């Protein structure tokens, strides 16, 4: 069996736990705005902030020097500390509730995930199945066989991974369909429902608006009630 060369991930070395814990506590507060918990009550719902941070840290390689297993990777201790602090700053920004849909913050996180994946692909370019397993232009898919409230597949999708979720409970299946299956099908599309009775500037803004993500779908839900 041909070995796979896998550098240590950031989650195996260190995490900015104080920032993650604070963001998770804030997320549980009432009145913070729209949240997946509003779709349907689900016990043991995982905080979105924790899910986002953990998936990022699982996908990003730790910068520290590593050797053994037929490969060398990373930088010396001093440089690794500086690089780790940079990655921590991304996580600290990523877990903030107000940055949940902040494209600038999400883009930085996605870029780091892709960079680590390409480093891993480069280490494994001699693998007999490299063309199948290590495509540097296609991130590995995310699978959650017991997705429950859907926090993990939702955040994996937000970080640029192709998400797949399943569950034995039909309520969980419905929640995940509503969060990760249906919205991407209508991403970037304008609403199709009856337009509200608007006049003047408000009407012009409604029809000239660029609908990003699932905004058009959300507007349809509001229009139809």
What do the PLM-derived regions correspond to, one by one?
Residues 1-225:
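S-adenosyl-L-methionine-dependent nucleic acid methyltransferase catalytic domains
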């Amino acid at each position: 069996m041909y070995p796979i060369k896998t550098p240590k991930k950031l989650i195996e070395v260190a995490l900015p736990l104080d920032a993650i814990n604070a963001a998770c506590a804030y997320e549980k507060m009432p009145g913070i705005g729209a949240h997946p918990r509003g779709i349907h009550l689900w016990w043991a719902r995982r905080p979105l902030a924790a899910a986002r941070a953990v998936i990022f840290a699982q996908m990003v390689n730790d910068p520290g020097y590593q050797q053994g297993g037929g490969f060398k990777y990373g930088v010396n201790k001093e440089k690794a500390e500086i690089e780790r602090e940079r990655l921590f700053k991304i996580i600290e920004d990523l877990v903030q509730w107000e940055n949940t849909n902040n494209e600038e913050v999400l883009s930085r996180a996605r870029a780091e995930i892709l960079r680590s994946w390409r480093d891993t692909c480069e280490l494994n370019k001699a693998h007999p199945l490299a063309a199948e397993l290590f495509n540097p232009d296609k991130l590995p898919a995310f699978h959650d066989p017991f997705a429950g409230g859907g926090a993990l597949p939702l955040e994996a999708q937000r970080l640029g991974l192709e998400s797949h979720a399943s569950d034995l409970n039909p309520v969980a299946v419905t929640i995940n369909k509503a969060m990760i299956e249906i919205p991407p099908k209508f991403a970037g599309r304008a609403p199709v429902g009856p337009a509200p009775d608007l006049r003047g500037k408000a009407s012009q803004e409604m029809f000239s608006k660029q609908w990003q993500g699932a905004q058009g779908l959300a507007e349809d839900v509001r229009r139809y009630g």
